[in-house]
């Protein structure tokens, strides 16, 4: 389990090679853990190892056939491998398990569109060599009578019609391509580099997730929030698709959560269902939260660089330290001296010094005009110090 947690940390930091090493060890130790193979499948997908990713997600489905997110991941991998029929069946299976997840509806629509478009593309590519001049002259060369001439004209007209139809189809395809090109010019792009970066932080009442990508809008993106998960998808300018799917650490109030679109980022503000501290953004195998919100106030999510290990909130409850001997006596002197007037402070200094520390008076009228004589405690004799 430690290897799985360590791999998750590397994965969040986008250190996929290191994460894969940890996931390999986790899959060996936890051979019956479907989540371990799912994590490794995600890591393989990030490293473009699509076949390895598909193998791992199939293992996850064998170990846990009722988890809808495994079917969603498998369908996406099949779609990327252009296995659209398998992808469609997988998405439909996942939708039957979790009908509330709108991501399945989106991917089913995409898969059907690809399946419908593939036959047209294959028929337009294969018939192109058939309308060549070779079949048309055959009736002319085989027949010597002039009567077949109308038939040749018919054949030429049909071939011309076919050519016209093909040209129309090509024109339609070109028109479609131009429309898609016009839309892809404004597709989102990462704010920096080729990877879409994300960050998150929490307050007492909300968890804020930020996706750093430019030109993301409500029309070109799909963001689905449920009480237990967040699903984000939008196409990128390089032709790929950004996907962010995560089961949340603790349930949220999706109705009270908000999504804000900016020119360089998307901010998703999710309201917590209860005032607890989230250890991570993603759900873990640990049952129950770390603690109530009083723990968040005592240990902030972003600690100060000058933070002390002392728990200052508990200071009022700590018993005061009891002083003894000279420390207690000096404390009394300091308290009296700090609160006294200027004459009282002068009287204390004069009486204490002249009496050798045996007399302490705050009455300047009494000690100011005469020398203070030392008064030793009972049973002791006062003697002058001889140098």
From Swiss-Prot:
Ranges annotated as biased composition (Basic and acidic residues): 308-323
SMART domains tied to this protein: TPR
Domain spans labelled CS: 193-282
InterPro entries: CS_dom, HSP20-like_chaperone, SGS_dom, Sgt1-like, TPR-like_helical_dom_sf, TPR_rpt
CDD domains: p23_CS_SGT1_like
Segments for region (Disordered): 110-193, 299-323
TPR repeats: 1-34, 36-67, 68-101
Listed Pro residues bias regions: 128-138
UniProt key word Repeat: yes
GO molecular function: protein-folding chaperone binding
Bias kind Low complexity: ranges: 118-127, 139-185
Function statement: May play a role in ubiquitination and subsequent proteasomal degradation of target proteins.
Record-given protein name: Protein SGT1 homolog
Gene source species: Dictyostelium discoideum
Gene: sugt1
